[in-house]
Amino acid sequence: MEATQADTIRKGPISRFLESLKIIQFMLFPNRTNPAALYDLLSTTNNLAEESLYLNLGYWKDASTYDQACQAMAAAVGDFADLTDAPLQVLDAGCGFGDQDEFWQRHYNNCAFTAMNICASQIAKARQRFPNSKVTYVEGSATAMEFPDNHFDRVIALESAFHFNTREDFFKEAYRVLKPGGILCLADVVGKDVELNWKMRIALYLGQGLWQAPKANDYSWSVYQNKLSANGFDGIETEDISPHVFLPFKRYANQRVLDPEVNSRINPILRKLWTMPHGGFEPSSYLLIKAVKKNQ
């Protein structure tokens, strides 16, 4: 039976204190290469979802709840990746607790989905939640994959590539494991070519620390596009969906943390972060990105 937020175990005061110290450590110290530790900390407790265990920012164009928005994001990425009912081999790099993969498997039943995550606890939880799943859940690194060359028709990274150490190393691995003509599709947070004021710089520093985003991944779309091209991809397409992501998410989060059930289980530091002004997202765009592996 699928686990939901209703099954979440509340943390005691000692666990909560240690968790708070870890959050502060993430934000203030420059080691930004351990996303598994971050997601172990987030676990199923520090999550805004109503029933699911989604962890993305959501696509809020027609959504009113977090679960709806996150599923809409999964649907948008599936469409942008040209998923079809054909028997495609699909890799999801950074699968979280598996919600998006189960959604895709239901809608593209003939595809074979492999869901990979560096966070062992999330893979274990996904297997527990979906014991009869057709999705194959694998623990592993997106920058050092244990898959053969030319194996997948699609490689997807839904709001995960900014964690990878580095994103460009992931591009290289995605190119290797994709078949010629295969598609790499990302939903990613990409820096803008803008001058940052001191408030933006502080917010960016703390945000990169909290979300374990390596400094090497902090670059604009022009650099991003060049890195894709340099690693063998062409046919690059983008869609900027920022207006339907950042501000609507923050508005929802501001209200969501007022719910007594959510308030009781989310770490107080994270509650404060969810209610902070929108400014932390100002130097970034939220892009859907698609690139094709050149035929060899």
Walk through the language-model features, giving the residues of each.
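Conserved alpha-helix/loop element of class I SAM-dependent methyltransferases that forms part
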Residues: 67-86
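Class I SAM-dependent methyltransferase SAM/SAH-binding core
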Residues: 91-144
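A short acidic, Gly/Pro-enriched loop at the edge of an enzyme's catalytic core
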Residues: 143-155
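A short glycine-rich, Lys/Arg-flanked "PGG" loop and its adjoining helix->strand segment in the class I
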Residues: 168-183
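Short alpha-helix
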Residues: 215-232
